[in-house]
Amino acid sequence: MKKGVLLNSEISAVISQLGHTDQITIGDAGLPIPSLAQRIDLALTQGIPSFISVLNVVTQEMQIEAAFLAEEIIGHNPLIHQLILTQIKELEKQQGNSITVDYISHNVLKEKTKHSRAVIRTGEHSPYANIILGAGVTF
């Protein structure tokens, strides 16, 4: 049995196969998932698992250098927005690098998910709780 924090075999496999600048998306329960992207559906019921809990586990396994958020999150979901920014700041300290955060429209974010290696669906039921993570390198 795997000893690490991330136990989900599909997510673990995707992260292990990422190269520099490859992307994965973590989304709320309503984010449309492109038919060509690998769909990893974790949603059990409303709020389970939460977006933040999935983000916390994924970022413990994945080296991050960039993040894309829908600009609408600022006004429509300030709590999740602040939790994301706090997580990114902590991750910068742990990784020893800067993480670029870009804000794009929700429609552009949905289009951009087409380039993700995988889209992880959570049970999150709050608006604009979506992020695209860009992989960095550990050296």
Swiss-Prot record:
GO terms for molecular function: D-ribose pyranase activity; intramolecular lyase activity; monosaccharide binding. Substrate binds at D28, H106, Y128, A129, N130. It is an enzyme of class 5 (isomerase). InterPro entries: D-ribose_pyranase (IPR023064), RbsD-like_sf (IPR023750), RbsD_FucU (IPR007721). Its main location: cytoplasm. The active site is at H20. Its EC number is 5.4.99.62. The keyword Kinase does not apply. One of its GO terms (cellular component) is cytosol. Pathway: Carbohydrate metabolism; D-ribose degradation; D-ribose 5-phosphate from beta-D-ribopyranose: step 1/2. SUPFAM superfamilies: RbsD-like. Keywords: Carbohydrate metabolism, Cytoplasm, Isomerase. Catalyzes the interconversion of beta-pyran and beta-furan forms of D-ribose. Belongs to the RbsD / FucU family. RbsD subfamily. Homodecamer. This is D-ribose pyranase. It comes from Photorhabdus laumondii subsp. laumondii (strain DSM 15139 / CIP 105565 / TT01). The lineage of its organism: Bacteria, Pseudomonadati, Pseudomonadota, Gammaproteobacteria, Enterobacterales.
